[in-house]
Amino acid sequence: MPDLLHDTQNVYHLFPIIVSEGKRDALHNYLEQNGVGTVCHYPIAPHKQECYANAEWNTPLLNLPITERLADEELSLPIGPSISFEDASIVVKLLNSFF
């Protein structure tokens, strides 16, 4: 976690990680089976979502490979200001046991 400045509190609400090699969904399922909820915030790359299908900028030539890779690999962990040290430790142990 990033260091905090003196007399401040964090407002972190997302802790995204990149899970490569096609393991994101397996990790998501593993964590869920062990009581840890996770979220894929953009499982479909924004430019491929139906709401942008007719956007002027969204042409067949649009090529956003990094965005598409992140849509396939991003997983947000439940780490924020309300999580206890003990709960964060459980998440870390589960991550270590998965990998």
Where are the predicted features?
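PLP-dependent aminotransferase class I/II
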Residues: 1-99
